[in-house]
Amino acid sequence: MQAFILSAGKGTRLLPYTKILPKPLFPILGKPVVEIILDQLKNLGITLIGINTFHLKDKLINFLKSYQKKNPQIKIRIFEEKELMGTGGAIINAKNFFKEETLIINSDILTNFNFEKLYYFFNQSFSPVVMVLHKGENNNVEVDINSNTIISFRKQKEDNLTFTGIQMIDPKIIKYFPFKKDLIDIYQNLINKGIKISAFIENNSYFKDIGNIKNYLKAHEDILIKKIKIPETTFYSKPIVVKTKNIGNNVIFKDWVYIEEDTFIEANTQLSKVVTWKRAYIKSGIYESQVLI
């Protein structure tokens, strides 16, 4: 099995932070989310990984080259896009990479899902595409539960499910992909033509799309407060994590915080539900539910 990480998006829901850092490099407890994904794939025994790039691609490419040097057993093939091609276009642009069944994962997904379960299900499904679904925040995927068959997308219903951003495909299906289209639209067209798209329903694992600030902060809260275990992240026994010594007088930490190294905090400051990045400078004041850089 091989894997492909979709990572070319502009991250508009994370502005203004994505003006300086591409979404795949957003740190979770100090570790880029794409590094967490790469480590998960490595621990699964996957040694060939493809990834597409567009927004602030030089920063992402430099990180990937550094990761590969540290992990020479992993081969990373980078597919640069001169313009955004959509998720379907990204697959077509890298079609020569897809020689066998491939695990595809969005680069903004934080999860502790056991990918091996998807692999075994895929091989028994006789379906060219299997999408991992759960009961989540955006329940717009309609599924025939009896046959694990997806019926439609983008219809909000109470009984519907949320796509986790994790799927597996047979490369033979790529010949049906039109250029520059979203994968969801492509799959709906395939369903309309009678091609089965299967659902792997998983409600016992953690999935968080960190593609907006609310969810980015919530992911930290889930790990620090609810003690959700992501094996590829550092475990902290307490919800107040302060890694800097540059702290003024009368600084108060509440609820949970993750304060990175080299952060400077002025005196008379209160921080609650806050994540800082390295070298952040925090002026005196009260901060709650914010990312400070």
Which residue stretches match the model-derived regions?
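Short internal beta-strands
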Residues: I49-T53, M131-L133, V275
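Catalytic-core segments of class I nucleotidyltransferases/pyrophosphorylases
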Residues: L103, L110, F115-N123, K135-N138, ...
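A structural motif detector for beta-strand N-caps
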Residues: E232-F235, P239-I240, T244-F253, V257, ...
